[in-house]
């Protein structure tokens, strides 16, 4: 795929709608080939660095398994296993790693870090997550949506994101809607809306591609007719405890539960989540939330919805690997 060869993958708006379509088609092919035992290795002899300043289960496993499937070797650099940004600048780290590796994945903090890595390394750099964007997650989401509504184009689908829409997921969803023409509805309190400039830019692009972007606080009108309802965690262990009560009070009404699913009026509506999800009391944080804030049976999503037939979160999680593989194959093989 010469269009992508040696290019970085930093955010979705760096690509055109047709390029995004090509990546999704490649991911679907690679997935089918793996399932059928017909996968052709395109990355034999390639060395890949995986920089993780923030831990992850799905992102790390997806990159590692995808690389191994394709014949590449990986080196994991965790937050305590490198000098990046501490004893060595991002620019210097990029220039060192670029001499040793064929590609670099970065998962961590500011978008400027992954952009600096891409600028100075001289090799493809892939954004596994930054504070601002999560593009590989959206590739998996879009592939999953295609699989569950195979007869529909993206500009015939309605995707609702309920909860805190001002984060990297909200930003990347806006970019995805801009390119695909999705009917995207961000159903959230105004305090949790994304930056107006990005909303305006993406809304104009979405309209040209047959879609629309809506921001609303009204749950009933926001979810009506939805094909998919998506949410993400409200708090994480890395955030100060004083933020928890404030965030929960702000978002409690936007929990994805059976009532919200019913308000869509669509008995076939599906539930999406980028994971991990606090849908029960079986994790340390889930237990703490239940005890301190009365959130038994789920925080951002109820256990009832998460464990229902409507939930396709694990299809989505699997597709992280197939879509990440597509990104690596597209950018590292001619």
UniProtKB/Swiss-Prot annotation:
L-ornithine binds at residues 168, 232, 236-237. It catalyses: carbamoyl phosphate + L-ornithine = L-citrulline + phosphate + H(+). Pfam families: OTCace, OTCace_N. Carbamoyl phosphate binds at residues 56-59, 83, 107, 134-137, 274-275, 320. HAMAP family: OTCase. PANTHER family: ORNITHINE CARBAMOYLTRANSFERASE SUBUNIT F-RELATED (PTHR45753:SF4), ORNITHINE CARBAMOYLTRANSFERASE, MITOCHONDRIAL (PTHR45753). This is Ornithine carbamoyltransferase. It comes from Salmonella typhi. The gene is argI.
């Amino acid at each position: 795929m010469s269009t992508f060869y040696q290019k970085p993958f930093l955010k979705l708006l760096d690509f055109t709608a047709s390029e995004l379509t090509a990546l999704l088609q490649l991911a679907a092919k690679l997935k089918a080939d793996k399932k059928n035992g017909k996968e052709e290795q395109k990355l034999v002899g390639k060395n890949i660095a995986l920089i993780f300043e923030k831990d992850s289960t799905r992102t790390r496993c997806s990159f590692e398994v995808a690389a191994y499937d394709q014949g590449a070797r990986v080196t994991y650099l965790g937050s305590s296993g490198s000098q990046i940004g501490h004893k060595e600048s991002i620019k210097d780290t990029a220039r060192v790693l670029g001499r040793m590796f064929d590609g670099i994945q970065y998962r961590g903090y500011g978008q400027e870090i992954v952009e600096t890595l891409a600028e100075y390394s001289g090799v493809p750099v892939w954004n596994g997550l930054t504070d601002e964007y999560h593009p590989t997650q959206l590739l998996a989401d879009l592939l999953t949506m295609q699989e569950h509504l195979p007869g529909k184009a993206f500009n015939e689908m309605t995707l609702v994101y309920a909860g805190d829409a001002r984060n990297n997921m909200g930003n990347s969803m806006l970019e995805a809607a801009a390119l695909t023409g999705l009917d995207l509805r961000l159903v959230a309190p105004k305090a949790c809306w994304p930056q107006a400039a990005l909303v305006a830019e993406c809304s104009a692009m979405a309209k040209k591609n047959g879609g629309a972007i809506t921001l609303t606080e009204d749950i009933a009108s926001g979810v009506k007719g939805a094909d998919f309802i998506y949410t993400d965690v409200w708090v994480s262990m890395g955030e100060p405890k004083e933020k928890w009560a404030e965030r929960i009070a702000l978002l409690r009404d936007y929990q994805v539960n059976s009532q919200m699913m019913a308000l869509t009026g669509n008995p076939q509506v599906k539930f999406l989540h980028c994971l991990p999800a606090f849908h029960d009391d079986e994790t340390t944080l889930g237990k703490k939330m239940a005890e301190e804030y009365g959130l038994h049976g789920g925080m951002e999503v109820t256990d009832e919805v998460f464990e229902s037939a409507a939930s396709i979160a694990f299809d989505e999680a699997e597709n992280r690997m197939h879509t990440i593989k597509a990104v690596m194959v597209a950018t590292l093989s001619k």
